[in-house]
């Protein structure tokens, strides 16, 4: 499995997470459509928020990055949210 973590801070980050929370049904549906989807979490932080996506392979997490980027461009461009810092890698342990 492969995971990608997007950390949103700075300009527009808190507002973006307000919007994601308000439209969580739409976000859930979109992320579940990603090929090889395993798990997804949105975590609110003091500076904005973090998303964690786990897929069966890197192709899935790459697709999730594009899906997230497209959704933000289509639905939150007016927030001028700073690009997230992105970390990714192989999953060593996955518990639920």
Predicted regions and their residues:
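Short S/T/G/P-rich N-terminal loop/turn motif that feeds into the first structured element of a domain
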Residues: 1-52, 56-70, 77-96
